[in-house]
Amino acid sequence: MTEMFELNYINYLFSEKTSVTLRQMELIAEGKRTPSTLFTAEKNQLQALFLSSLSLSKSEWVDRMKKLSDLGWLTQEEGRYQITPSGQQSKKAFILNYPLLNCTLEMSDALTRKEFWHWFIFVTQILSEFSYGNKGYIPYISDRLTQNRIKKWLAEQGFPQKPLAVMWADEIKAFLETLPDELGTFIVNQMIGHNYEGMTKRQTAEKHGMTSLEVLLTTEILMDRLSRFFEESDLLKSLWDTVHKSCHYGLSDSAYRSMTFLMNGSSIHSTAAIRKLKENTVKEHVLEAVLISKYTGYKPLIPKEVYDQLRKLFLSEPSLSYAQAQQEIQQLEFFWYRLVEIERIRGCL
């Protein structure tokens, strides 16, 4: 059952536009932030695989892809895997059986979804124990740095802890009421509070008849859904925003630092000099921000005449290669080409 769910999930990730090697799948799942890996995820619509809960070794990837090929769901041509009509039918059936998957997961939120769950559980524990005047509990999160960040967030809310606990409970209740009973119970069973130890992931899997991967995916998707339930949830929104910032909005630490300079008006050259990096490294950071966080302030980094030429070329030939573009535009930087190519893929030209 565990392996069959994995196979269905991997097959679900494929679309008609997906054509990838096994190694590319592996790198995307690991959350590698190189421009080439991120671009592969974008081009092949594999954003949901980025930093995935699907944790497989190289040999396990080989095994799963072989089994998917044997099932006739995927086909392999020159080392690249593509979904077959049979695979598309299996994907539709899988979504019908697991409708939570019928959603869009952004790469920028991949780490935030995971971290937010832990902050969410810990804040619930803190406020629950406070309500009963208990200071002698074992904290859900043992890391001191994270503990201090959460305590700082609680202090910044501007409410005494007692009314804060009531507000928190009300917001959680309102969110749970939007879910089917089974999913609401799924969350509540894992929560921690005064004299209440939530279930472990293993216990949750047994209780709900799920695989371990299904528990992780369900948790992430519910946290993503929670992040969209903010119109009447000031505390939950504030916590999400704080976690998202602590996760550098999905960027690597180095890319986040470079983008901070660039967004404050620094040039690529100046940013590279200040940070003692190569200019190409800063350009890679820009591509990371565009691909992960959908940063849109990059156009001033492309000479206008070059941008206009590239746009015209892509409109006439959507599959335009860098080599072809170089024949039309002298001294064309790959960085400029890639930025406009991303626009073309996203339908923004």
What name fits each language-model region?
Residues 66-79, 228-231, 295, 345-349:
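A short, conserved structural fragment
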Residues 60-75, 221-223, 289, 344:
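Basic amphipathic alpha-helical segments that dock to polyanions
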Residues 25, 203-206, 271-273, 321-328:
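Short alpha-helical "recognition helix" segments of helix-turn-helix
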Residues 226-243, 293-309, 348-349:
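Short Lys/Arg-enriched helix C-cap and helix-to-coil transition segments
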Residues 75-115:
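Accessory beta->alpha helical hairpin/"wing" motif in late/C-terminal subdomains of nucleic-acid enzymes
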Residues 1-56, 148, 152-162:
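Short, amphipathic alpha-helical interface elements at domain boundaries
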